[in-house]
């Protein structure tokens, strides 16, 4: 929303169930999440259409998260392959493709701890032009800590757009719930 286009997003999935496992990348940016964001910006889209796209985006995200936690993500595998390239050896075309570099430049790096005891926590951005976003899902609140380089971005501007998106999403759900409760029961 802030930039007007999707960007590479990193969210960590734990792979500790595997010996020496650490993390894998959950690829949050998907065709489904893009379709949802576009629907939210489309003044002609109905709340029902937006909700359908929201559900599709959530379903895709959950699937991606489960696959990453099961070791079926791509980023650590690609990292391993890249590390096998010998000095002086020409990297395969995949690693020379600009899209590969762009998709691994995490403009948005996120992670969460869902606990009532943490009031705030955080980490910095992983690229100079990015944001580090730590969040917690609590019983009655969502908390965010947003970090970025002051010379490049404004954390308060990011916070504005994040808050606006949350308000819009809540309003959409409220309208749908009102319409559902107002409809005649058969």
Residue ranges and their predicted role:
Residues 1-186:
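Acyl-CoA-dependent O-acyltransferases
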């Amino acid at each position: 929303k802030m930039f007007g286009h999707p960007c590479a997003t990193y969210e960590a999935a734990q792979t500790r169930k595997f010996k020496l496992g650490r993390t894998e990348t959950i690829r949050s940016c998907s065709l489904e999440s893009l379709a949802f964001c576009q629907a939210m910006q489309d003044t002609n889209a109905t709340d029902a259409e937006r909700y359908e796209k929201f559900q599709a985006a959530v379903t895709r995200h959950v699937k991606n998260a489960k696959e990453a936690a099961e070791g079926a993500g791509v980023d650590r595998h690609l990292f391993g392959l890249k590390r096998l390239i010998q000095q002086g050896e020409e990297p395969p075309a995949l690693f020379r493709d600009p899209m590969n570099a762009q998709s691994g430049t995490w403009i948005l790096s996120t992670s969460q701890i869902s606990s009532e005891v943490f009031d705030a926590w955080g980490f910095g951005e992983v690229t100079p032009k990015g944001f580090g976003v730590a969040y917690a899902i609590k019983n009655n609140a969502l908390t965010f800590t947003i970090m970025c380089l002051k010379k490049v971005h404004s954390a308060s501007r990011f916070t504005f757009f994040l808050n606006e998106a949350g308000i819009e999403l809540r309003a959409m759900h409220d309208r749908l719930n009102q319409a559902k409760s107002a409809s005649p029961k058969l």
